[in-house]
Amino acid sequence: LAAGNAVVWSPAASTSVCAVKLAECIVDAELPAGVFNLVTGPGSVVGDEIVASPGTNAIGFIGSTETGYKIAERAAGKALLLEMGGNGPVVVLDDADVGKAVEASVIASFLCAGQSCTAGELFLVHEAVHDEFRDKVATRAQGVRLGDPFDAATNMGPLNNEPVAAKMDEHVRDALERGAELVAGGARVSGFPTQLYYEPTVLDQVSEEMEVARDETFGPIVPIRTIRSEDDALATIEESPYGLLAAVFTRDLARGLRFAEAARAGWVNVNASSNYWETHLPFGGRAGSRSGIGRVGGRFAFDSFTELKSVVIDLG
């Protein structure tokens, strides 16, 4: 809209009611008829038609990698801005302020029950501070209060839907079968109006072949993998199919900046939660990764929703 385009919005089917409420606000703003349009329904039907329509010139999408790939295939030749999945590596180096790293990690993994593309998904912790980090983050996880999200005393609400919860179940099960140690949580919680409440979970002794180390869990989980050096962490980030965001903790700012430059991610936070980002800065995945293409944030999204035109004039 800000770039001068008419918009057709197809929200996730599970958020249709919220989308309608927002659309009502937009209608109340008295935009000209036809400038903003809302179409609800299954993405495989409604979204597919919108993406493939000859009248659609550019597509912006935030969601799963699998859906993003389908959109890219259907929208061949059109401008794309795709912000997709991540495996948010959080790196705790040997000189880190462990207390600060723990508090930031709790936010990274348990804010919105871990249902964020910027959530902490894999914790690469140096062996020198591993035990302290593990014990402290487990204590914080056990102190998280589950409940009604509208209750001010609640720290964490439920997962969004059954497929998300089932994926959390699968990642925990797979990790434990492959030798991970369950330090905290690890199961759904009964006694709530829905079976989608999940214990804040901490896993230790995570290894590279586990699903939780390779894929996006999208749940309240802290999977810890021990590293012996910065190079170990950088190699793990390099090998990941994702490349959206990373975080690193160190008391040495110069070291943190060197790490940020070397890490193959579209965004790196130094001594801050992976969930922290500034909306005016460019945000998106590294080239060739499963995390998307293009950049959201401030003026940078305009690159995908405007035409760059060259005009040559002969003044002779």
PLM regions and their residue ranges:
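Short glycine-enriched loop/turn motifs at secondary-structure junctions
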Residues: 33, 53, 84-86, 116-118, ...
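Rossmann-like NAD(P) dinucleotide-binding subdomain of oxidoreductase/dehydrogenase enzymes
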Residues: 1-100, 227
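Hydrophobic packing residues within well-ordered alpha-helices of enzyme cores
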Residues: 19-22, 50, 71, 133, ...
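Conserved residues at the C-terminal ends of beta-strands
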Residues: 39-42, 62, 108, 250, ...
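Hydrophobic alpha-helical packing residues
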Residues: 19-22, 36, 86, 137, ...
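Conserved C-terminal structural/oligomerization subdomain of aldehyde/semialdehyde dehydrogenase
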Residues: 31, 56, 91, 145, ...
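Structural detector of well-ordered beta-strand residues that form the stable sheet scaffold
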Residues: 1, 8, 37, 81, ...
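ALDH superfamily catalytic-core signature
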Residues: 58, 66-207, 230-231, 270
